Amino acid sequence: MRKIKILGLIVLSGLFISALMISGEVPANAADGKIVIGMVDAISGPFKASGDRFQLGAKYAVDEINAKGGLLGKQVTLVVEDSSFKPDVAVRKATKLILEDKADVLIGCLGSHVFLAMMKAAEKYKVVAVNPNSEAASITGSEFNPYVFRTTPTTGQRTAATIAYFAKYSKFKKFYILCQDASLGRDAGEGFKQNLKKIPGSQLVGEDYHPVALKDFAPYISKVIASGAEVILTTNFGPDLGNLIKTEGQLGCKAVTGGGYLFDPVIMQDVKEAGLGHLVIHHSLIDLGNPIQKKFVKDFQEKNKDLDKVFYSPVFGVNDYYYGMQWMFDAIKRAGSTDSAKLIQAWEGASYNMPWGKVTMRACDHQIITPYKAALIVKDNEFFSFPYTGKPVVIPEEEITVPPSQTGNARCK
């Protein structure tokens, strides 16, 4: 009888611990000497090229910290799942990473609409989800949950930086918004409209939102030309940006495109001279005049010398995941644990020195506060034989930071 009671207690204890692990109240891998990072991203479909490189940036960060002895005395394991760039798939894969792979922390993913779905799984199971990529303002704004930390700026910051550049470095007055019909594009459209008010005499001469993964941009670019727009404002990325730029060139559109992710070397290798003179805006633009970033590029390329230099160059997305994970590792070290409650407490309000300057994780919305960089696409550059970014200029954080009261986040006053 006593053996039966003891056996029953063991079974009940096991069930209790399992329940705690699933709820996120204790680190799932505390007992087996490893820390699991679960990554969800687009590694198939039309945006596979981006997801593949993001994965490489994450792996580089993990390999680097493991080579230094690991994190909290444990080796870090990266488990990657494919979102297929679909919200429902991302939720399913995030849930699998938490329940089956016992992920201590989640990271991802391309597509704000995809991450908005994925972050609900993080909240349900009380697991911190780090976002080094998706920029829709609603992620840390109206849809905020306390398990999300974003190490990339919002559409509010991106659009403010874009308009700040045009206000300071150009005389353009006629603007046309052309974005994806998705969370990122819609949030960006609102941000562009709000920030255009800062340019005296500016005109919004057109506004369109196109389907994601669009093949034919000719009807949209024809409308841009007819409007007399001097600038196309967009947050397009991947094929949607490449096709937009190529169509501009084919139809003889003279407008400057700004706000998108044209520092993607895969896209620039494709569009070539059609990209000349367009504007790149990003907080972590690599500047080889910066010794820290120059060493990062050199070390990264040396380790990955057998891979295609253009495709796997650490200048787009790769560095965002790398730097985002470095900051996450720092927060875990200061928390002394991957326990979600402790990690949240340690990361809220924390500052970190990035190669481009000091950044802060704003406590109320878990949003990075950072300066921005802007650069034009030029023919002769330090990176590639095809056109790429020239020397960047810095846009101070005080010019682009969205005030807490304007984020749509109920915690921010």
Describe these PLM feature segments.
Residues 33-35, 351-413:
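Solvent-exposed, acidic/polar segments of extracytosolic/periplasmic ligand-binding ectodomains
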Residues 49-56, 70-141, 151, 210-217, ...:
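Beta-alpha junction/loop-to-helix N-cap segments that form part of ligand/metal-binding clefts
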Residues 245-322, 329-338, 387-413:
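Extracellular/periplasmic periplasmic-binding protein-like sensory domains
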Residues 31-34, 56-78, 197-200:
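Signal peptide-proximal N-terminal region
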Residues 1-36, 67, 407-413:
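Short, low-complexity disordered leader/linker segments with a strong preference
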Residues 88, 102-207, 254-280:
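Extracytoplasmic ligand/sensor domains, especially the bilobed periplasmic-binding protein
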Residues 26-39, 68-75, 167-173:
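Immediate post-signal peptide segment of exported/extracytoplasmic ligand-binding proteins
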Residues 34, 38-59, 81-88, 110-111, ...:
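Extracytoplasmic "Venus flytrap"
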